[in-house]
Curated annotation (Swiss-Prot):
Protein's name according to its UniProt entry: NAD(P)H-quinone oxidoreductase subunit I, chloroplastic
UniProt entry tagged with the keyword Metal-binding: yes
InterPro entries linked to this entry: 4Fe4S_Fe-S-bd (IPR017896), 4Fe4S_Fe_S_CS (IPR017900), NADH_quinone_OxRdtase_chainI (IPR010226), NDHI (IPR004497)
Cofactor field: [4Fe-4S] cluster
Functional note: NDH shuttles electrons from NAD(P)H:plastoquinone, via FMN and iron-sulfur (Fe-S) centers, to quinones in the photosynthetic chain and possibly in a chloroplast respiratory chain. The immediate electron acceptor for the enzyme in this species is believed to be plastoquinone. Couples the redox reaction to proton translocation, and thus conserves the redox energy in a proton gradient.
Cofactor note: Binds 2 [4Fe-4S] clusters per subunit.
Subunit description: NDH is composed of at least 16 different subunits, 5 of which are encoded in the nucleus.
EC number(s) on file: 7.1.1.-
Gene that specifies this protein: ndhI
Amino acid sequence: MFPMVTEFMNYGQQTVRAARYIGQGFMITLSHANRLPVTIQYPYEKLITSERFRGRIHFEFDKCIACEVCVRVCPIDLPVVDWKLETDIRKKRLLNYSIDFGICIFCGNCVEYCPTNCLSMTEEYELSTYDRHELNYNQIALGRLPMSVIDDYTIRTILNLPEIKT
């Protein structure tokens, strides 16, 4: 065939392909138009965290048997467990337990492998301070129950559920 005709056919095919790609992008843009906004006004509005959210660790002093499994499974050997061996009953007595949240990577291994379930993850994620030494929580600070976002009447909660397509 003539070279001019083949160039014209290639040009037509490329034009159709480009129009199809532009149309696909436009359809994706239009499909996002009916979704809820992601932006929230943070201090006054908060998202309700998911059930398996890994926030601050909660510690129950009475349940801990000082087995140090949490220290062994932690990738950075973070929890500090101080205990004393009671010779008359041959058991460990927990003296002090602390976690530095400035170093913690919130992997959840300590919670998952604890044999007595004395550790649990909370939905609390606001741990920012001006002094990094305030992020070192002892057993008293770890034992404090967090205030649920849903129970706080001063904050508007936003439930961000994925869309269910029917």
